[in-house]
Amino acid sequence: MSDTLLNPYFGEFGGMYVPEILVPVLKQLEQAFVEAQNDPTFQAEFADLLKNYAGRPTALTLCRNLTKGTKTKLYLKREDLLHGGAHKTNQVLGQILLAKRMGKTRIIAETGAGQHGVATALACAMLDMPCRVYMGAKDVERQSPNVFRMRLMGAEVIPVQKGSCSLKDACCEAMRDWSANYETTHYLLGTAAGPHPFPTIVREFQKMIGEETKRQILEREGRLPDAVIAAVGGGSNAIGMFADFIDESNVRLIGVEPAGKGIETGEHGAPLKHGTTGIYFGMKSPIMQDKDGQIEESYSISAGLDFPSVGPQHAYLNEIGRAEYVSITDEEALNAFQELAKHEGIIPALESSHALAYALKLIKQNPEKEQLLVVNLSGRGDKDIFTVDKILTEKGMK
């Protein structure tokens, strides 16, 4: 792999572990990406779509009520306000422009919560590209509003009935399709994971989240935050937030994995802290696997965090100690979901609720501490209201 244009590794993590047939395809993608990054016309078109179609820059909102009685200032980076309802739209626009540049005529994608699927469907509709989205059958059931949105915008949604019927199985099916149709098809991967160059492409097409946050917080507070906090599944919203702060050594980078029903139960999605390094989904990264190397089922109340591995740059940031990775249970995320809705009038995605829950935990631990925190509110919670309603009804909490 010494003949790649960009470094395919982050420390020991990353790489390009794919069938031989896909290696030239990935190298073609890398070449097109490097050229596009240096092409002012491509950059201008991408910037125009982000501004006039997606609605960037997104707001940085101060929480007025959640921190009452404490000395914390808590800001939310409002990716939930982006067209499509989540941060996913950013990099989808970039990748489809890249696919068109490469002469591809068809887009495929995988989706968990459905947010990446919706972003892919809306961008394909606008940029006139046929689109197929693979989605675990379990996720099709629990994210029905997003399935309807995708189909409404012309996408073909394929429920995947294999394995755990969740995101990892959708990823495998998308890979199979791509292997068979790579000449005409671009696989629009939804997170900062997978084989090189996807982790780098996705980070570069998401890093405006952190760049905008830095500008906005300096404008509002005259200083950088003490910590930026983001949920981590595959890791795209978090790396988008972290990228511009990595060199700011005084800013803590905190990634929040799903602890599900509790780490001790084994029903979680926290491979960074509770997995082991292995090869999965075309990359070397921490994964949830048994002693024989078989991939274990991940679990989270949040479909978008229900993934047994994590992007290689997060693995590297964890290893070198630049970022901290913690975990939050379903119950803690549910509480944060309700708190934000009740006190700030914002309904967050269950994914983002994990990051918010950790911020609230930090504040509660030391209410007298003067601190400036930013949570990446990666998506809105419309898609989750039926899931939450059902859980609260079952618990008799309504």
Swiss-Prot record:
Matching CDD domains: Trp-synth_B
GO MF, one annotated term: tryptophan synthase activity
Catalysed reactions, semicolon-separated: (1S,2R)-1-C-(indol-3-yl)glycerol 3-phosphate + L-serine = D-glyceraldehyde 3-phosphate + L-tryptophan + H2O
One GO term describing the cellular component: cytoplasm
Keywords: Amino-acid biosynthesis, Aromatic amino acid biosynthesis, Lyase, Pyridoxal phosphate, Tryptophan biosynthesis
Family (UniProt): Belongs to the TrpB family.
Subunit structure: Tetramer of two alpha and two beta chains.
Protein name from the UniProt record: Tryptophan synthase beta chain
Source organism (scientific name): Haemophilus influenzae (strain PittGG)
